[in-house]
UniProtKB/Swiss-Prot annotation:
It holds the Pfam family FKBP_C. The keyword Isomerase applies. This is Probable FKBP-type 16 kDa peptidyl-prolyl cis-trans isomerase. GO terms for molecular function: peptidyl-prolyl cis-trans isomerase activity.
Amino acid sequence: MTDQVLAEQRIGQNTEVTLHFALRLENGDTVDSTFDKAPATFKVGDGNLLPGFEAALFGFKAGDKRTLQILPENAFGQPNPQNVQIIPRSQFQNMDLSEGLLVIFNDAANTELPGVVKAFDDAQVTIDFNHPLAGKTLTFDVEIIDVKAL
């Protein structure tokens, strides 16, 4: 009888990963976390994770705990000035506006487009359609629970 040592499955293509994560901003604010609830499970390459975050996980195995920094270019990108629009105030009748208010618009294909009110006056409203985390360096604390080959 021979002893076989099975290599621990590492994160890579054709794997399913279960992990806990906490997403923090540079100022330390936690944006999202699974540590106080059920862990997240995903298949590598399924598009559910930021590509930069997913790539940073490659090579990790169950039991690994790491802190990863993801630069804006590998996360939500830099803010695009063309995603800031000025809209006539008349399109917001009967709406109580405030800076920071999230407003949902529908495009021609009826897809929801969230935007944040950046400024407003009696004539116009400035809406920022950039992702709220655009331009931010993200920190992920991760604990790998399980890695399975698919």
